[in-house]
Swiss-Prot record:
This is Signal recognition particle subunit SRP54. It is found in: Cytoplasm; Endoplasmic reticulum. Keywords: Cytoplasm, Endoplasmic reticulum, GTP-binding, Hydrolase, Nucleotide-binding, Ribonucleoprotein, RNA-binding, Signal recognition particle. Pfam families: SRP54, SRP54_N, SRP_SPB. HAMAP family: SRP54. Its EC number is 3.6.5.4. GTP binds at residues 109-116, 191-195, 249-252. Belongs to the GTP-binding SRP family. SRP54 subfamily. It catalyses: GTP + H2O = GDP + phosphate + H(+). Signal-recognition-particle (SRP) assembly has a crucial role in targeting secretory proteins to the rough endoplasmic reticulum (ER) membrane. SRP is required for the cotranslational protein translocation for ER import and preferentially recognizes strongly hydrophobic signal sequences. It is involved in targeting the nascent chain-ribosome (RNC) complex to the ER and is proposed to participate in the arrest of nascent chain elongation during membrane targeting. srpA/srp54 binds to the signal sequence of presecretory protein when they emerge from the ribosomes. CDD domains: SRP54_G (cd17875). The keyword Transport does not apply. The keyword Kinase does not apply.
């Protein structure tokens, strides 16, 4: 992952400071800033930006003027976080397409940056959100450009327009946009040829296309591997095409990536999406605070919820699974649905970055091995009968020969079948707890409907204290419910089901679920197998 090493180094610098027992203000603070600046420079972030960030952090923490009661370590952490956010946030609002009218989006960028693939990714992204989308290939310079766009668009089931005979890209773009406007398409994305700041003819061609289609938004596609050249190239494109947004591609690689971030400061233009892989679904919405949180290992739960909602949208089976879990039931079919949802969400490394604390747990896992193990689990499910899938797994205990039959039918081993069933038992136990908690919350809601709520809440708090439940640690199995104000929100139906749950995954505690899943994908599984194999 791009900038992963940068995140580790910055995190280590801040953690070293916060772990020290005595804060030697000057020495510890200067050492931390020095390490952060060295990490940013090694990640190809522009030198002037690093110097500016250094001054900003120093000026925002004035030890002499702080009251004695202030937690200086927390203040330093916040200063570092805020300055890193400002590094990637130009405070410019990007264009937002409107439904019911044609929104023309034009892509520009260097050759090989991934424009054509990103065009299809963005079209698919908007298509999944209810927009009527289309693609126009105005790249008449590169051999095979139209064929590539045609192949991608066909795969994503998106209408496209291009020409194998017309060589003037401005004419092709104008014809394509006019055609799709007439057919009332809401998002029309125009792909153009890759160009370099030294190629004046291609830059002139770009302005001609822009004049022909009058786009509502022009997007610069920037390769994360470009390094220090990013600032000069993006400035040249800004002067000619005046783009209003940036998409950074190839962020799943191991390049430094800081150069692309420098382009934000150089052009005062917001990053709107990150390309996180070669597949059409590998496009993440960029949000500065969430990006820095992930960079520092703090997770991005809001992004995860949005991702899960997009994947499980309108899924009848996901709704059925949620209903089962809310009742404390978890069948093998429900488990299969959860595995399918996780596979749709992308590689485990991508998901783990969104969950606080889980990125370290999955650091050594190979995504390809992990996805293969998930596929083998699906093979096992597909070899089960309807009665086995809709059961609770007890029939396998009563008739172990069923495991042998399933292993033979799925091309797996008996040990793998045993591991899957063991994992299901753990998940079923979690579902049972979620169902029990929901019933308790319903009883508490009913109890609070009449009478003095404050008195009833105080009485409940006393009972919890007597049971050892009120110490700020929250209820068992319900993360983040430490204070009573949050409890009131949940009692009134505002907190969602289960505190740590997510739609499409049945409201279960996803962090626990993913931790167990990563264990299984890492080879150990849930344990509990008797070691037999075939």
């Amino acid at each position: 992952m791009v900038l992963q090493d940068l995140g580790r180094r910055i995190n280590a610098a801040v953690n070293d400071l916060t772990r020290s027992n005595n804060l030697d203000e000057k020495q510890a603070f200067d050492d931390m800033i020095k390490e952060i600046c060295a990490a940013l420079l090694s990640a190809d972030v522009n030198v002037r930006l690093v110097q500016s960030l250094r001054k900003s952090i120093k000026s925002s923490v004035n030890f002499a003027s702080l009251p004695p009661a202030v937690n200086k370590k927390r203040l330093i952490q916040k200063a570092v976080f805020d300055e890193l956010v400002s590094l990637v946030d130009p405070h410019a609002e990007p264009f937002r397409p409107k439904k019911g009218r044609s929104n023309v989006i034009m892509f520009v960028g260097l050759q090989g940056a991934g424009k054509t693939t990103t065009c299809t990714k963005l079209a698919r992204h908007y298509q999944m959100r209810g927009f009527k989308t289309a693609l126009v290939c105005a790249d008449t310079f590169r051999a095979g450009a139209f064929d590539q766009l045609k192949q991608n668009a066909t795969k994503a089931k998106i209408p496209y327009y291009g020409s194998l005979t017309q060589t003037d890209p401005a004419i092709v773009a104008a014809e394509g946009v006019a055609k799709f406007k007439k057919e009332r398409f809401e998002i029309i994305i125009v792909d153009t040829s890759g160009r370099h700041k030294q190629e004046e003819e291609l830059f002139t061609e770009m302005t001609q296309i822009q004049t022909a289609v009058t786009p509502d938004q022009t997007i610069l596609v920037l390769d994360s591997t470009i390094g220090q050249a990013a600032e000069a190239q993006s400035s040249a494109f800004k002067a000619t095409a005046d783009f209003g947004a940036i998409i950074i591609t190839k962020t799943d690689g191991h390049a430094a990536g800081g150069g692309a971030i420098s382009a934000v400061a150089a052009t005062h233009t917001p990053i709107i999406y990150l390309g996180t892989g070669e597949h059409l679904m590998d496009l993440e919405r960029f949000e500065p605070k969430a990006f820095i949180q992930k960079l520092l290992g703090m997770g991005d739960m809001a992004g995860l919820v949005e991702h899960v909602q997009a994947v499980t949208k309108d899924s009848a089976s996901a709704k059925e699974t949620y209903k089962h879990i809310s009742e404390g039931i978890y069948t093998l079919r429900d488990f299969r649905e959860n595995i399918t949802s996780i596979m749709k969400m992308g590689p485990l490394s991508k998901l783990s970055g969104m969950i606080p604390g889980l990125s370290n747990l999955t650091a050594g896992l190979d995504d390809e091995d992990g996805s293969m193990k998930l596929r083998r689990m699906i093979y096992i499910f597909d070899s089960m009968t309807a009665a086995e899938l809709d059961g609770d797994g007890k029939m396998f205990v009563e008739q172990p020969s069923r495991m042998v039959r399933i292993a033979c039918g799925s091309g797996t081993t008996v040990r793998e079948v045993e591991d899957l069933l063991s994992q299901h038992r753990m998940m079923a136990g979690m579902a049972k707890r979620v169902g029990g908690q929901k019933k308790q919350m319903q009883r508490a809601q009913n109890m609070l409907k009449g009478g003095n709520k404050e008195q009833q809440l105080a009485a409940m708090q006393k009972r919890m204290a007597a049971m050892g439940g009120a110490g700020g640690g929250g209820f068992p199995g319900m993360p983040g419910m430490g204070d009573m104000a949050k409890m009131m929100q949940m009692l009134q139906g505002q907190g969602g089901g289960g505190g740590g749950g997510l739609p499409g995954l049945g409201g279960m505690d996803l962090q626990s679920m993913m931790s167990q899943m990563s264990g299984l994908m890492g080879g150990g599984g849930g344990g509990g197998g008797r070691g037999r194999g075939r």
